[in-house]
Amino acid sequence: MKTVRGIVESTGFFTAEEIEVAVELVDAGLSGESISDYLFLFCEDVSGKVLGYTCYGRIPCTLGSFDLYWIAVHSDHQGLSIGKKLLVKTEEKIRNMGGISVYIETSSRDLYKPTQGFYLNAGYHEEATLKDYYSPGDSKIIYVKHLS
């Protein structure tokens, strides 16, 4: 999907491999292919242009735990609270599906400091860090928010 590719490329955060994964997930999800339980939420402007999206889903073999796999807003539209609104609406959908907790993973690299702050400001807390997970010096940080 060109729209999702444009969004994730514009952020400057994702590798070529990650961009391909994002596009494949949305393509498969929207075509009706069975690819587990990936769900999507898109934010559009009044003309129908997609400005950002989330990809989330129930974590298999858990009771009420969900992963937020992707959240991205086109760089032309960042700073307008679109990401915050997408996150809040995604949490609402998760809560309505019986969700209890939302988990988010991100990189420890300096590039991701704004992302880490975004999650903290949204009420998530750091649950764990997996040292050198992505590569030497690039750890995985896992955030969680317990929904009420």
What kind of feature is each model-predicted range?
Residues 115:
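Helix-turn-helix
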Residues 94-107:
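Conserved GNAT acetyl-CoA-binding A-motif
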Residues 81:
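Conserved G/P- and acidic residue-centered "switch" motifs that form tight phosphate/ATP-binding loops
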Residues 1-69, 74-76, 84-89, 93, ...:
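Acetyl-CoA-dependent GNAT
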Residues 72, 108-110:
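Active-site-proximal loop/turn and secondary-structure-junction residues that shape catalytic pockets
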Residues 60-63, 110-111, 133-135:
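Short glycine/serine/proline-enriched coil/turn segments at secondary-structure junctions
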Residues 105-108, 120-141:
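Conserved catalytic-core motifs of GNAT/GCN5-like acyltransferases
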Residues 26, 112, 136-138:
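Short secondary-structure boundary/hinge segments and terminal tails
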